[in-house]
Amino acid sequence: MLKKDKSELTDIEYIVTQENGTEPPFMNEYWNHFAKGIYVDKISGKPLFTSEEKFHSECGWPSFSKALDDDEIIELVDKSFGMLRTEVRSEESNSHLGHVFNDGPKESGGLRYCINSAAIQFIPYEKLEELGYGDLISHFDK
């Protein structure tokens, strides 16, 4: 399983995950990335989302219709910047991931997890076994 010490984070990774920051839309690694695989917490390595739930939302950040495991996600009320939103954090590392909104695809439950690329790492399907995520291969064989 991939893990990263907080001292190894880049400036933007630290700002996003530890200071509740947001990276620029359309200028991040995964906003337009649709390869088959999983997205894990940048710090803990815990699986959070899969490419099966990723969709193109035109918002400029990676968007997912649901989390891989709801127990790995914490949702908190966020009243920053004069808005009322739902913040999404990783349960294991308590890292800020992004926000969840109710404007996702209706056929997939209506949620849009809007996630900062700087908070996640993509693991290609072909590397799941090698990197310790082999138990998730069956998720793609449904």
From Swiss-Prot:
The active site is at residue 114. The keyword Oxidoreductase applies. It is an enzyme of class 1 (oxidoreductase). Its EC number is 1.8.4.12. The keyword Oxidoreductase applies. InterPro entries: Met_Sox_Rdtase_MsrB (IPR028427), Met_Sox_Rdtase_MsrB_dom (IPR002579), Mss4-like_sf (IPR011057). Belongs to the MsrB Met sulfoxide reductase family. Stereospecific for the R isomer of MetO. This is Peptide methionine sulfoxide reductase MsrB. It comes from Staphylococcus aureus (strain NCTC 8325 / PS 47). The gene is msrB.
